[in-house]
Amino acid sequence: MANENVTKQNGNICFIEDTHKYFDITAPEKPFISVTTLIHRYAQPFDKEFWSAYKALEKLLSKDAWTIEKKSLLNTKKFDKEILASYNISENDFNAAQQGILDAWAEKNRASCERGTQIHLMMENSVYGSDRSKTLKKFGVGGKFECKKDYTELDLEHGVYPEYLISRVSKDGVLRLAGQIDLLIKNGNEILIGDYKTNEKIDLKSGFDTTTKSNAKMLYPLNNLMDCNFSHYQLQLSTYAWMLQKINPEFIIKDLLLYHIDHQGNETLYHCDYLKDEVERMLLHYKKQIIKEQQKLKRQRIEY
């Protein structure tokens, strides 16, 4: 990996924006998993094929016909194209409608990512410039804070670290975790972690799962948490907090904050719980999975 492609670096750990990859310059062959990618592994998988078919059928059916079919589809979470003949819908028309749904999703995701990147850059620059105190006030922080561009040592008494690259490698080298904290504020040993979210909305609860008759939960061992983006974000900030306390056990996590800017420009601040127990369960489970995969590969190598 060429150094000229590096977007950000903290010690030996580097990040490349184009590929969204983290690596150690002393051992680039050993992969890191990002905090957000790891958390996504424990979210319920999104069946894009089913849900695009579901939305396409909704678009093609009358309101009364859709009311009849909707319940069955939600109960089974399976789509059989034989249903099309019952309503004289050609497969070509259905495929076109489904592709239209998929294309709309892809465009919405592209536009959302572009908007998010622009807002993150704007917020980062505001912390370096004269608007620093104004930005910090959004997180309920006042007073004089120091901010040095590309400075990574966590030794400023009253310091602000925007887009802070953080990593953790377990002593045995099995767990290799990295991520970027949008806004790290250090006041003595008190730590505030802020994160900017620019998606359409923050879901505080997950949808109702008709098979379990309860709100959808994340996958084991996080099945005590609702499977909604607020839970995912709480885990993200909690993982950053856990990593910081591994760097310095004297750090006190004062607050974990989500600063949400919706698509209408409305700004909302959410306080998150520090889910330390859940983070440690997740990391232990993931580490066990890595070890199992490594053992499986070793067994395959000795087979003849």
Question: What residue ranges belong to the model's regions?
Answer:
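Charged, glycine-rich intrinsically disordered N-terminal tails and low-complexity linkers that flank
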Residues: 1-118, 304
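Catalytic cores of nuclease domains that cleave nucleic-acid phosphodiester backbones
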Residues: 4, 100-222
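Intrinsically disordered, low-complexity coil segments
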Residues: 29-30, 63-71, 168-176, 249-251, ...
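Short, surface-exposed secondary-structure junctions/capping segments
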Residues: 52-56, 60, 213-215, 289-291
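Glycine-rich, flexible loop segments associated with nucleotide phosphate handling
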Residues: 93-104, 219-233
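Metal-dependent nuclease catalytic regions and adjoining charged, substrate-binding loops involved
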Residues: 217-219, 226-304
